[in-house]
Amino acid sequence: MFTVAPVHAASGPLGIDHRLPYDNSGIWARHNQLLLEDGVILTELGGALWLGGQNRLGKTFWQSIDSSAFTALTVQGMKYAFGRERPSQTDNPNEWFKGGQSFPSGEVALQASFVTPFIAEYSHNHPWVWALEALPAYDAVARMKTQGHWQTDVLAGWAVGTLWGIYAHDRQTPLILGIMPHGIYVGLHATF
């Protein structure tokens, strides 16, 4: 006699979406996710303003700001366009065009958009910089555990952030730095 264990069916656009058991404790707690988000934004702004755009690291910080800005605009537009409901709102990952804000994950996109210019710039000389991918990886798992996103939401957010990060890195002059009055090529730490 054969017995069949219960199987949790996955669905969604790639057939992998399912709601994870809710876990808002320890490192997965929502307040830790928000601390990471705030820390990344402060690090980007602080590093860019402190270093300016004349040296390699400063330019990379400005590329990261470009990447994050482009990512935020793209993600918000996609959220309005797709209107997918979050796992906390429904157990059906196929609830699209319902006015939700689940697809794609903006926070995972932010993490990917932050780390990608640094990885693109420094990975050839410093392979350890790939460890920065732990930031979007952590945020992806945390967002799913707190039922803020489906699996495809975090993958799409990661992809959007990575693509804008590559684009921003490949630009000779960071866009935001170039459109500011007189640019901010000299950082606050510069000595004259």
Q: What is the role of each PLM region?
A:
Residues 172-181:
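Transmembrane beta-strand segments that form the barrel wall of outer-membrane beta-barrel proteins
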Residues 181-192:
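Outer-membrane beta-barrel "beta-signal"
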Residues 4-6:
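N-terminal signal peptide c-region/cleavage motif recognized by signal peptidases
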Residues 107-111, 149-169:
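Alpha-helical transmembrane segments that form the membrane-embedded catalytic/substrate-binding core
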Residues 8-104, 108-144:
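Hydrophobic alpha-helical bundle signature of multipass membrane enzymes
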